[in-house]
Amino acid sequence: HAGVLAMTFSEALGSGIVRHPTVACFLARTWDFLIGVGIDSTRIRFRQHASTEMAHYADDCWDCELHGEYGWVECVGIANRTCHDLLSHEQHSGSKLLRAWRQFDEPRSEARDVLAPNGASLGPTFKDRAGDVMEALQNLTEIPESMPFELTLADGSTARITDDMVTRRSEEVTLHGEWFTPHVIEPAFGIDRIIWHILDHCYTETQKKGENYSIMRLNQSVAPFDVAILPLFDKDGMDDIARQIWASVNSMPGLRGELDANKSIGRRYARVDEIGIPWAITVDHTTLEDGSVTVRRRDDQEQVRASIEDVLSKLASDSISTLF
């Protein structure tokens, strides 16, 4: 057991800890996904399965564990199943139809043993199937060690090949591609566990004016709304401007705005913070005078004023944070 090591995925692959580049890619993509939905990067680790606990079909297996109130919990599993499933099917069915063809960028030449068809014997034996048998013989990538053997044809049927039907010889062949059995990387995500840890990592509780004050610092990508639009009062034209802003936000692809005009502005800010909306736009008396609004940032409650046009533009370009 190597213990806990801190390194990049590239370093883990280069040192042989991660055994296949595709597995390293899946580990890195899992990391990116978890960070993107708001998981704390300091509370993520990847644990490699020991050979004694690995599934019989796996060549390498990793768990992504997240740390929360209940300690380290497995939330993602990534297994390199290699070609176990397809190869097992091929061995038991005798069919090679589950192989895939890989075309080379440039033709390659190599010396190999081949079984040259003997038409004088194949023709009378297989009659109208003789052409299919010859094609299958020419496409053989593994020469059998002994005769007779069962040859699988393109349609999945088989033909029994005996010594008199072929001549074994070595020749220079030009290869334009190769057949291979695809490998499978199997990721499994525990969505409920991930969601629980998002909430666990993002929830904070402080004191404000002698009362508990909750803030859910959700990443904007998973927040219930991108922005809350709050008229200071639901009258005097502030409500109309707020509804116009709300309609503009909800017309933008990928953005959702929440309009809230109920209770005091302080109570509404608290509701916005509690459910994790990252931004709040407040329409007040100054808005009626110069068309500017207050933009409030959830995580530190900082506020700035900007024109409605500027705020909408920065929301659309995902750059509203540049106002601060």
Which ranges hold each PLM region?
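NTP/phosphate- and nucleic-acid-binding module
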Residues: 1-324
